[in-house]
């Protein structure tokens, strides 16, 4: 049976609908950076998605390729994730200013993926999918201490969940700890093309520190 990160790391992918504190281990991702409204047809965000999935599936399907990846095990491709920020010193997000978004869209990779394996997968996906993958990168992220919560509902309703997370953290002696390396993080467990907005499930995660 294929290894499923969502099942093996339930505390990271299936948190409660109530806020909680978690320490997130370092992870590797295939990632694409960009700017602009994620809903814009033909925008940078929409264009990034096939690049990410192309590389992720090239690694997954390497079991059928001539290349042997050391330590390989079959896995379910993890959900799409995103790190988001705007040009605000406090790290907060203004959902009314979607054109001002900066993002790193990404998909988690198994730890067995080396730089050489990644470069091979990029070349493989570029050849098979006829894609320009020059924007794709191998990203290592160490989030560390965070507050997180499962948000259920439309993206534009996220501020209410974030307010609850902020209050929960403050009551326990934590403060937000946003920086260039520690960002607003979302994990998308639902496909918005197939799911009603009120049923969307999104893990929201924010970096924190003890006061």
Model-derived regions, located:
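A solvent-exposed interaction/effector surface
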Residues: 1-211
């Amino acid at each position: 049976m294929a290894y499923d990160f969502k099942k093996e790391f339930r505390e990271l992918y299936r948190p409660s609908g109530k806020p909680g504190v978690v320490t997130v281990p370092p992870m590797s991702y295939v990632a694409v950076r960009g700017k602009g409204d994620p809903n814009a047809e033909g925008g940078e965000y929409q264009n990034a998605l096939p690049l990410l999935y192309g590389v992720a599936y090239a690694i997954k399907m390497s079991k059928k390729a001539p290349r042997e990846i050391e330590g390989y095990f079959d896995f379910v491709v993890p959900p799409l994730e995103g790190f988001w920020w705007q040009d605000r010193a406090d790290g907060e997000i203004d959902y009314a200013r979607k054109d001002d978004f900066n993002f790193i869209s990404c998909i988690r990779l198994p730890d067995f993926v080396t730089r050489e394996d990644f470069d091979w997968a990029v070349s493989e996906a570029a050849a098979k999918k006829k894609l320009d993958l020059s924007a794709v990168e191998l990203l290592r992220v160490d989030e560390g201490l965070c507050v997180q919560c499962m948000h259920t509902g439309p993206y534009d309703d996220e501020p209410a969940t974030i307010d609850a997370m902020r209050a929960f953290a403050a009551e326990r002696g934590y403060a937000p700890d946003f920086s260039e390396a520690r960002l607003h993080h979302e994990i998308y467990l639902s496909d918005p093309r197939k799911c009603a907005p009120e049923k969307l499930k999104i893990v929201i995660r924010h970096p924190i520190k003890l006061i």
